[in-house]
Amino acid sequence: MALTKADIAETLSDKFGFNKRESKELVEQFYDEMSEVLVKGEQIKLSGFGNFELKDKSARPGRNPRTGEDVPISARRVVTFKPGQKLRAQIDNYGTA
């Protein structure tokens, strides 16, 4: 199961009493803010959860796995996520209780 924006908005509505429209707008604003920060090349640090960061990957040679043909892989920017200690601990301990 995947957690969607709609799921997050519904949880906000249920737990905090926001109406559906308000909770959807709040989630959209949060995603927009995160996107804007990353596009500017800045980090997002969510305490206890983890960090999102934009990294530049340089061009490099690659290979088509079907044909074995050499193919250039162009330079690009990627978003990376590094989980925080609390999240790592929760994941490590999942199902062991």
UniProtKB/Swiss-Prot annotation:
Q: Which UniProt keywords apply?
A: DNA recombination, DNA-binding, Transcription, Transcription regulation, Translation regulation
Which CDD domains does this chain map to? IHF_A
* Pfam families listed in its UniProt record: Bac_DNA_binding
Give the UniProt record's GO annotations in the biological process aspect.
Answer: DNA recombination; positive regulation of metabolic process; regulation of DNA-templated transcription; regulation of translation
Q: Does the keyword DNA-binding apply?
A: yes
InterPro entries named among the record's database cross-references: Hist_DNA-bd, Histone-like_DNA-bd_CS, IHF-like_DNA-bd_dom_sf, IHF_alpha
Citing just one GO molecular function, the answer is: structural constituent of chromatin
Q: What is the superkingdom listed in this entry's lineage?
A: Bacteria
Q: Which GO terms describe its cellular component?
A: cytosol
Q: What does this protein do?
A: This protein is one of the two subunits of integration host factor, a specific DNA-binding protein that functions in genetic recombination as well as in transcriptional and translational control.
Q: What family is this?
A: Belongs to the bacterial histone-like protein family.
Could you describe the subunit structure of this protein?
Heterodimer of an alpha and a beta chain.
Protein's UniProt name: Integration host factor subunit alpha
Look up and give the organism this protein is from.
Hydrogenovibrio crunogenus (strain DSM 25203 / XCL-2)
